[in-house]
Amino acid sequence: MSLLSLSWLGLRPVAASPWLLLLVVGASWLLARILAWTYAFYHNGRRLRCFPQPRKQNWFLGHLGLVTPTEEGLRVLTQLVATYPQGFVRWLGPITPIINLCHPDIVRSVINTSDAITDKDIVFYKTLKPWLGDGLLLSVGDKWRHHRRLLTPAFHFNILKPYIKIFSKSANIMHAKWQRLAMEGSTCLDVFEHISLMTLDSLQKCIFSFDSNCQEKPSEYITAIMELSALVVKRNNQFFRYKDFLYFLTPCGRRFHRACRLVHDFTDAVIQERRRTLTSQGVDDFLQAKAKSKTLDFIDVLLLSEDKNGKELSDEDIRAEADTFMFGGHDTTASGLSWVLYNLARHPEYQERCRQEVQELLKDREPKEIEWDDLAQLPFLTMCLKESLRLHPPIPTFARGCTQDVVLPDSRVIPKGNVCNINIFAIHHNPSVWPDPEVYDPFRFDPENAQKRSPMAFIPFSAGPRNCIGQKFAMAEMKVVLALTLLRFRILPDHREPRRTPEIVLRAEDGLWLRVEPLG
C-alpha cells in the first residue's frame, strides 16, 4: 500500500486513504475560499477609502446604532449630511459597508444607470416577495421593462381623470366622520390612522371597483393589508428573521402567511370574475359597458394590456401588480397628506392662503367638488404640498445593489458588489442643496426658484427609469384631499409634538395627532 509522507510535519508515515485525501482537498478548498474572501474584503475596503466615514463605535460594531429608525436617529442623520454633504460610508458590523449618497450630483450617477448595473435584489426587497411577487417594485431586467411598458398606459391622465370623483367621495366619508367626532367633542385625531383608511378605501375602488366601506366598518381584506405592512416593518428590524424558512416558523411568520393568503385570494377572485366577464362579453362590449360607467379600473387595464406580439399578462402577473399598487399606494399617500396637514397646522398663514385659493377656485360651484382641470389651478397649495414632501418625504430611503463598478462625476468609484443607500431624507435636508433645510418654506417651489435646482434635489417619488409609476395618481389624490380638507376644516397643532420614525414610510411614533375644527 502506498504511503503518504508526513515527515515534514514531524509525523510518521501513514497509509493514504480516500477520506484523508478528501479532508485535505476540502480543507484546501475552504482555505482558498477564506483567502479569496479576505483579499476581496480588504481590496474593497481600500477602494472605499475615497468615501469619508463617521467615527466607528469599535472595530466589531462599526456604525451599528449610529442612525436608528427614531427621531434621534434622524437628527443624527441631519448632522451627518451637514458634515458629509456628498455622502459617507457606514459599516454595519465589521464586514458590511453601506454607501450613503446624499447629494443630487452623486445620486444621479446611480439612479440613472441601467437596472442591470444597479439592481433591487437585496435583503429588504426579498422580504416582500411572498406578498408582492414579481410586480414592478420587485421585478428586474427584461420582466421589469416589459411590465413597465404595459403598465404605463394605466397612469395616463385619461385613465386618472375619473378617479378624481373616487378621491372626493372617499374624502367626503372621512370628513363626515370628522364632523361627527367634532360634534361629540373629539376634535383631536390621529390623522395618519384616518387618512390611511381613506387611501385604502380609494385604492380598492380604483384598482378593483370594490367598495368595502372600510372607513365605517372593519374589512377583513383591509385589515390584512395593514397587518402585512406592519409585519414587514417588524421583520426588517430583526436580522435573524431574514431567511424565509426561519421566519415562517415564527408566530409572526404564520400570521404573515395567513394574511398573504387572504389578500391573494381576494385579488385572484376579482381577476377571475373580471376575466370571465371579458370572455363572455368580448372586448368591444366590455369597453362599451365601461364607457357608460366612465371608469376603467386598474384590473381592467391590466387584463386588456398586451405587447406588440399580442402577449398578455398572466393572472399571476396581474395579481402581483395589483397587490404592489395596494402596498405602494396607501401608506405613502397617507404619509404625504398627514405631514402636509401637520406643517400647515404649524404655519396658519400658509394654511389660510391655501384655503383662500381653494375657496376662490370653487366660489361659484355647487356642490364644492374638485375636477381634474382644477388641479393645475392650485399653485400655492401645490407649493405647500411639495415643500412638505421635501421636509417629510414619505419614502425616506431606498437601496440599490451595484453589480458593476459605478463611476461618479468626481471620478470616485463605487466598487461592484456594494449596496448604495439613496437617502431621500438626507438629500432633502442637505444644507449644501437646500439653505436652512429644517425650515418649512413653500416658496422654495416657486417655479423660478425650482428651475435653478438640480432635478435630483427633490425626489419624493424616486427618479430615473425606476421612479414611481404612480406619482401622478398620488399627487392628484393628495391635492384633491388636501383642498377639500382645508375647505371644510381648520387644522390646528396638538400639544404633543410628533416624533418621526422612518419605517417603510415616514410615520410619527404613537400617531400624528392634530386638532380639527369644522368651518361654517
Swiss-Prot record:
Its cofactor is heme. It is a single-pass membrane protein. GO terms for molecular function: alkane 1-monooxygenase activity; heme binding; iron ion binding; monooxygenase activity; oxidoreductase activity, acting on paired donors, with incorporation or reduction of molecular oxygen, reduced flavin or flavoprotein as one donor, and incorporation of one atom of oxygen. It is found in: Endoplasmic reticulum membrane; Microsome membrane. GO terms for cellular component: endoplasmic reticulum membrane. The keyword Disulfide bond does not apply. Pathway: Lipid metabolism; fatty acid metabolism. It catalyses: an organic molecule + reduced [NADPH--hemoprotein reductase] + O2 = an alcohol + oxidized [NADPH--hemoprotein reductase] + H2O + H(+); (5Z,8Z,11Z,14Z)-eicosatetraenoate + reduced [NADPH--hemoprotein reductase] + O2 = (18R)-hydroxy-(5Z,8Z,11Z,14Z)-eicosatetraenoate + oxidized [NADPH--hemoprotein reductase] + H2O + H(+); (4Z,7Z,10Z,13Z,16Z)-docosapentaenoate + reduced [NADPH--hemoprotein reductase] + O2 = 20-hydroxy-(4Z,7Z,10Z,13Z,16Z)-docosapentaenoate + oxidized [NADPH--hemoprotein reductase] + H2O + H(+); prostaglandin H1 + reduced [NADPH--hemoprotein reductase] + O2 = 19-hydroxyprostaglandin H1 + oxidized [NADPH--hemoprotein reductase] + H2O + H(+). Keywords: Endoplasmic reticulum, Fatty acid metabolism, Heme, Iron, Lipid metabolism, Membrane, Metal-binding, Microsome, Monooxygenase, Oxidoreductase, Transmembrane, Transmembrane helix. InterPro entries: Cyt_P450, Cyt_P450_CS, Cyt_P450_E_grp-I, Cyt_P450_sf, Cytochrome_P450_Monoox. GO terms for biological process: arachidonate metabolic process; icosanoid metabolic process; menaquinone catabolic process; phylloquinone catabolic process; prostaglandin metabolic process. Its EC number is 1.14.14.1. It comes from the Eukaryota. Belongs to the cytochrome P450 family. This is Cytochrome P450 4F8. It comes from Homo sapiens (Human).
